[in-house]
Amino acid sequence: MDLLLIIAGLVAAAAFFFLRSTTKKSLRLPPGPKGLPIIGNLHQMEKFNPQHFLFRLSKLYGPIFTMKIGGRRLAVISSAELAKELLKTQDLNFTARPLLKGQQTMSYQGRELGFGQYTAYYREMRKMCMVNLFSPNRVASFRPVREEECQRMMDKIYKAADQSGTVDLSELLLSFTNCVVCRQAFGKRYNEYGTEMKRFIDILYETQALLGTLFFSDLFPYFGFLDNLTGLSARLKKAFKELDTYLQELLDETLDPNRPKQETESFIDLLMQIYKDQPFSIKFTHENVKAMILDIVVPGTDTAAAVVVWAMTYLIKYPEAMKKAQDEVRSVIGDKGYVSEEDIPNLPYLKAVIKESLRLEPVIPILLHRETIADAKIGGYDIPAKTIIQVNAWAVSRDTAAWGDNPNEFIPERFMNEHKGVDFKGQDFELLPFGSGRRMCPAMHLGIAMVEIPFANLLYKFDWSLPKGIKPEDIKMDVMTGLAMHKKEHLVLAPTKHI
C-alpha cells in the first residue's frame, strides 16, 4: 500500500512538472540572450552603463526583450510605442515595485513613494504631496531660496572671472542644489564646506547607493545568507541607523517650541503639521514623515545639478547653440542684471536646450523598476506576473521611429519645429525623464525650477570657454551612473563677465 502511494505521488509530481513545463513553453515570451543555469544573464550585465548595454541588446532582439537575472525574469522596453502601451494603456497592471532588500529598508518599508507599492496608502500620500508639497503655489513659495542661492553661486563665478581663472561647474551646481534642497526641506542653510553639510552628503550618498544595490536575497532567495557573509547586511543596517538618527534629529528640532520662526515653511514644517492634524484614514507617523522627506532629498539633490551640467556641456561643444541661447536670454532680459523666474516662459530656446539635454542624457536613464501584477501582453508577447519591467529611457530617447534619422545629434531646434509640442510632463512617451503614469515623479515642477534659474543666469551673466589647450572635441562624455546619471569627468570652464 505504501509503495502504491509513493508511486502515485511520483506520478502526480511528474505530471505537475510536465504540465508546468508545457505551460511555460506555450507562452510567447519576448526574445532575449541565452543565460547560464542559476545566474541567468547576470554575468553579462554591465555595472556602470547598463542603459548602453541594454540599448545594444535592443538592436539585436527588438524593442522588448527578456533576460534572467538570477532567479528573476526581467523585461526591457526600448521604444516610445511600447513605453506608451506599458505606462498608459496598461499602466495599472504595472504599478507594483519588486520587493528589493535595500529599497525596502532605506525607504522605511515602502513608506517612501518612489519605492513603495501602489496601495491605498500610496494614493493618499501622492495626493497629499501634489496638494501640499509640490503644487505650483508651494514651488513658487521657495522662489526666494532658489534665487538667493543662485546669486551666491554667481558671486563665486564672478570672483573666478576677476582672477581669469576656471570654475568647476559640476561642483558649484551640486553645492547650489544641496543648499536649495536643505533650505526647502529642513529650513536650514548648511555651510557648504562645514561638518553638517558633509554629514548630510555622506548619509545621502550612502542612501542612494544602497537604494540602487541588488542584494543576493533579491536574486537568489535561498542564498540570502551571502548578504551577511559579504557584509552587505551589516552595511545596510548601519546606513539605515545613521539615516534614521539624522532625520529624527531634524524632527525633534522642528518640534522644539523654542525653535526660531521660519520665514517660509519648509517641507518638514508642513509634514509635521500634517502629523499633528492626522487628516488621513491611515495613521501618519514619524516614520511616514521621514519617508516623505526622503522623497524630497534623494531625487532632488543631484538630479538638477546633473541636468545643468549636461546642458552646459552640450552648449560648449556646440558654439552656435551656445550663442543662440545667450542671444535669446540677453535680448529678453536686457540690462536688468539677472534672470528671475517670471522671465523663463519668455525663453523658448533655453527650454528647448533643456529638453534636448534631457533627451540625450536623461538623468534617470532607466526608470525605476516596475513589476507585473498579473499576466499581461506587451507588443504581442506574454509577460508573466511578477516579471520585473525596465523602461530604458535612454534608449527610448534614441528611438528612430520617434525621433527620425538623427536621434544621436544635439539639435535643440527640433523642439521648436517638428517636435514643438513634445514635453516631459508624461504624455509624450518619446521623452520620459520624469516617467509617466501613476508612478510618475510627483516633484517634476520643483525639479525643473531648480534647473531653469541657474542655467539661465549662467548664460546671461557670463561668456564661457574651455581651459587653454582643450578643444570641444576633447570633452569626454562618459557617464557615472547611480540613481542619477552624472557626467563622469567634472565640467571645468573659464568664465568671462558679460554683465
Swiss-Prot record:
<dbReference type="GO" id="GO:0009684">
    <property type="term" value="P:indoleacetic acid biosynthetic process"/>
</dbReference>
<dbReference type="GO" id="GO:0009625">
    <property type="term" value="P:response to insect"/>
</dbReference>
<dbReference type="GO" id="GO:0009682">
    <property type="term" value="P:induced systemic resistance"/>
</dbReference>
<dbReference type="Pfam" id="PF00067">
    <property type="entry name" value="p450"/>
</dbReference>
<dbReference type="GO" id="GO:0010114">
    <property type="term" value="P:response to red light"/>
</dbReference>
<keyword id="KW-0472">Membrane</keyword>
<keyword id="KW-1133">Transmembrane helix</keyword>
<dbReference type="InterPro" id="IPR036396">
    <property type="entry name" value="Cyt_P450_sf"/>
</dbReference>
<keyword id="KW-0408">Iron</keyword>
<keyword id="KW-0349">Heme</keyword>
<dbReference type="GO" id="GO:0005506">
    <property type="term" value="F:iron ion binding"/>
</dbReference>
<dbReference type="GO" id="GO:0005783">
    <property type="term" value="C:endoplasmic reticulum"/>
</dbReference>
<dbReference type="GO" id="GO:0048830">
    <property type="term" value="P:adventitious root development"/>
</dbReference>
<keyword id="KW-0812">Transmembrane</keyword>
<protein>
    <recommendedName>
        <fullName>Cytochrome P450 83B1</fullName>
        <ecNumber>1.14.14.45</ecNumber>
    </recommendedName>
</protein>
<feature type="binding site" description="axial binding residue">
    <location>
        <position position="441"/>
    </location>
    <ligand>
        <name>heme</name>
    </ligand>
</feature>
<dbReference type="GO" id="GO:0042742">
    <property type="term" value="P:defense response to bacterium"/>
</dbReference>
<dbReference type="GO" id="GO:0009759">
    <property type="term" value="P:indole glucosinolate biosynthetic process"/>
</dbReference>
<dbReference type="InterPro" id="IPR001128">
    <property type="entry name" value="Cyt_P450"/>
</dbReference>
<keyword id="KW-0479">Metal-binding</keyword>
<dbReference type="GO" id="GO:0016709">
    <property type="term" value="F:oxidoreductase activity, acting on paired donors, with incorporation or reduction of molecular oxygen, NAD(P)H as one donor, and incorporation of one atom of oxygen"/>
</dbReference>
<dbReference type="InterPro" id="IPR002401">
    <property type="entry name" value="Cyt_P450_E_grp-I"/>
</dbReference>
<dbReference type="GO" id="GO:0052544">
    <property type="term" value="P:defense response by callose deposition in cell wall"/>
</dbReference>
<keyword id="KW-0560">Oxidoreductase</keyword>
<dbReference type="GO" id="GO:0050832">
    <property type="term" value="P:defense response to fungus"/>
</dbReference>
<keyword id="KW-0503">Monooxygenase</keyword>
<comment type="similarity">
    <text>Belongs to the cytochrome P450 family.</text>
</comment>
<dbReference type="GO" id="GO:0005886">
    <property type="term" value="C:plasma membrane"/>
</dbReference>
<dbReference type="GO" id="GO:0009641">
    <property type="term" value="P:shade avoidance"/>
</dbReference>
<dbReference type="GO" id="GO:0005739">
    <property type="term" value="C:mitochondrion"/>
</dbReference>
<feature type="transmembrane region" description="Helical">
    <location>
        <begin position="3"/>
        <end position="23"/>
    </location>
</feature>
<comment type="function">
    <text>Involved in the metabolism of aromatic oximes. Catalyzes the oxime metabolizing step in indole glucosinolate biosynthesis by converting indole-3-acetaldoxime into indole-3-S-alkyl-thiohydroximate. Probably required for glucosinolate activation in response to pathogens. Functions in auxin homeostasis because indole-3-acetaldoxime also serves as a precursor for auxin biosynthesis. Specifically metabolizes (E)-p-hydroxyphenylacetaldoxime into an S-alkyl-thiohydroximate.</text>
</comment>
<dbReference type="GO" id="GO:0000162">
    <property type="term" value="P:L-tryptophan biosynthetic process"/>
</dbReference>
<keyword id="KW-0341">Growth regulation</keyword>
<dbReference type="GO" id="GO:0020037">
    <property type="term" value="F:heme binding"/>
</dbReference>
<dbReference type="InterPro" id="IPR017972">
    <property type="entry name" value="Cyt_P450_CS"/>
</dbReference>
